[in-house]
Amino acid sequence: MTIHTDDFAPSPPPARERVVSAAPASSQEEALERALRPKLLQEYVGQAKAREQLEIFIGAAKKRGEALDHVLLFGPPGLGKTTLSHIIATELGVNLRQTSGPVLEKPKDLAALLTNLERNDVLFIDEIHRLSPVVEEILYPALEDYQIDIMIGEGPAARSIKLDLQPFTLVGATTRAGMLTNPLRDRFGIVARLEFYTPDELARIVMRSAGLLGAPIDAEGGMEIARRSRGTPRIANRLLRRVRDYAEVKGSGHITLDIANRALTMLDVDPQGFDVMDRKLLEAVVHRFDGGPVGLDNIAASIGEESGTIEDVIEPYLIQQGYLQRTPRGRVATLAAYRHLGVAPPRAAGGLFESA
């Protein structure tokens, strides 16, 4: 059973929708994601190292009848951190309670969650790097000793009492592990970094999702969707749904390589998985800032996007694919970026392109 504590939290302001954004576009999309989500580790595709470690640690915890060590999952958005938290709870045969860092505004919010956990339950906190310091302080003794201190009363009559908690597992997820405080990071016994997926792994996910959606698809069509999905399952599933719509209206309903190509071209997703925002970023660095180095704030102002979105959502894939470099002096366009834009690289670039 999963209990969401943030179902009635205020909605964040709507973001500019990008079909290749790794963030969920809407609550409807989140519901569709849940329907496609694997339930067990053996159904989970990719992340072989993390999957193997979790399989061993979960098996050992079940044999001993103990709570699993606290788990930290980090990496770019859309790679399956929430999915893994659900799988961990399912594999352990316990309840999952789900919340997020921004929702836990006061110590009493966290205390209410912790005191309602049953033995060996899983508490999933998304965006755990956004916990407030006062809430984080309450969490430390809960993680180490399964105890919390709460204040009873007000003013001079106020007193602190210690409450014992049931053993539990905290699963924390973050896209920005560097923003976690050292005391919090050190309390996680299991730390797993989720990496971008390979096209072959994404193709397996696309074919599985197409089967669940009842969408006929060729292997070639599935691979084309996978290649343009930026290494991210959430994007792969979103593109699959868009291509399915195109196939039903413009074709016979069967997703072939040709249908996938035409649909993705209509969506302005190029063969590298780049969209307008990616190209705007590369063009800004190359044309407006002479290839860099250029600071993140200057890029954000140039393309009209928040610096946090660039750093968390747009940049990681460009860096991972070798189109952008992050240096101490700022962002620098690589030779691949110049080639992608069809622009001749500068000759005097500190030797960066001389060997190419």
Curated annotation (Swiss-Prot):
Summarize where DNA binds, as residue positions: 326, 331
Q: What is its EC number?
A: 3.6.4.-
* Residues binding ATP, per UniProt: 36-37, 78, 81-83, 144-146, 187, 197, 234
What keywords were assigned to this record? Answer: ATP-binding, Cytoplasm, DNA damage, DNA recombination, DNA repair, DNA-binding, Hydrolase, Nucleotide-binding
Catalytic class of the enzyme = hydrolase
Annotated Mg(2+) binding sites = 82
What domain of life does the UniProt record list for this protein's source? Bacteria
Q: Where is this region: Head domain (RuvB-H)?
A: 271-356
Compartment(s): Cytoplasm
What does the subunit section of this Swiss-Prot or TrEMBL entry state? Answer: Homohexamer. Forms an RuvA(8)-RuvB(12)-Holliday junction (HJ) complex. HJ DNA is sandwiched between 2 RuvA tetramers; dsDNA enters through RuvA and exits via RuvB. An RuvB hexamer assembles on each DNA strand where it exits the tetramer. Each RuvB hexamer is contacted by two RuvA subunits (via domain III) on 2 adjacent RuvB subunits; this complex drives branch migration. In the full resolvosome a probable DNA-RuvA(4)-RuvB(12)-RuvC(2) complex forms which resolves the HJ.
Name this polypeptide is given: Holliday junction branch migration complex subunit RuvB
Q: Gene name on record?
A: ruvB
